[in-house]
Amino acid sequence: MGRSRSRSPERRRERRRSRSASRERERRRRERSRSRERRRSRSRSPHRRRSRSPRRHRSSSISPGRLKDRRDDDKKDSKESKGAKERQIAAEDLEGKTEEEIEMMKMMGFATFDTSKGKKVDGSVNAYAINVSQKRKYRQYMNRKGGFNRPLDFIA
């Protein structure tokens, strides 16, 4: 039998190694992305959380009892600071005012007609986006498995 014209086995191995390193990397990356996809549910419907508030992750370092204490402290602090603010405004702004102005300030609850633009304001003053109209969303039924070619349904 004649001698093979292909490269020697040593060189063939070296070349295979250099190719396989990049292939191996690519294959690992694909496997990782596949395993991530498998973890997700197979449902196509958008995943909705029950509450619209952002998720809060608990840190394991604080015990539930400690968390409750901290909440109580925060509530006390906020109540005290609100009362202090009102008293502080009244004490400073009462100087140099007539009795009518003082009476009106007490009745209205604020001292001046200064703008609140660009300032942080406590309370429900910031509830400005109540009546936002959103575009209607439709659920797709056509061109999908089990859709029976029925038209798009409105999602309330």
From Swiss-Prot:
Skewed-composition ranges (Basic and acidic residues): 66-98
Location(s) in or outside the cell: Nucleus
UniProt key word Zinc: no
Biased composition (Basic residues): 13-59
Family designation: Belongs to the SNUT3 family.
PANTHER family: U4/U6.U5 SMALL NUCLEAR RIBONUCLEOPROTEIN 27 KDA PROTEIN, U4_U6.U5 SMALL NUCLEAR RIBONUCLEOPROTEIN 27 KDA PROTEIN
Protein name in UniProt: U4/U6.U5 small nuclear ribonucleoprotein 27 kDa protein
Species this chain originates from: Xenopus tropicalis
Name of encoding gene: snrnp27
